[in-house]
Each structure stands twice: as structure tokens, then as C-alpha cells.
Amino acid sequence: MSRAFVNEDAGAAPERYPLPARDDPGYPLAAARALLRGADVGDTPGAEAATGLYFGDPALKREVEQILAESQEDGNERLEQLAERFLRRVARGRA
């Protein structure tokens, strides 16, 4: 078999979205940040898999509203745009 098809030298995939334990009180905010980061880099499916939540999940509405306020205060227009997009999805459901 060609070495091109052998993955024996591959290591574990690097952790793209480091998150605290799910029972950690900071998990929802960290998950919201991970989902927004994933959307920013074009890896929404990876962020959703890492968090177990989806982009626009109403369970994270409060956290994303907090991130939106922070981004507006900091002048981070890209993060503001992503947070607003997330909240629009919350408002209309997962569709």
C-alpha cells in the first residue's frame, strides 16, 4: 500500500476549541466564544462538534448578548457582526 494512504504517523488533532468541563459555570460563555470563533474562521461544523451546541442555539442567547455588548464597547466590528448573526438565528429558530 502506498504511504499516501497510511496515516500511522499522524498525531492527535490539535484542540481548536479549548473548553472547560461542561459542568463548569464558565462553559456557556466559552462555548459561545468558540462558536463565534468557528464561524469567523469558516469552521462552524468543527465548533459545533466541539461544543455540542449549534450556531444560533437559544441556550447561549444571554452569553452572545454579553459578547455583543463587549464587541461594541471594544470596537470589534467583526465579532459584533458574528454575534448579531448568531442572535438573528436565535430569533428565527434553527432554520
Labelled PLM ranges:
Residues M1-E63, D74, R85-A95:
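Long, non-catalytic architectural segments outside compact domain cores
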Residues L79-E80:
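Solenoid-repeat scaffolds in large eukaryotic assemblies
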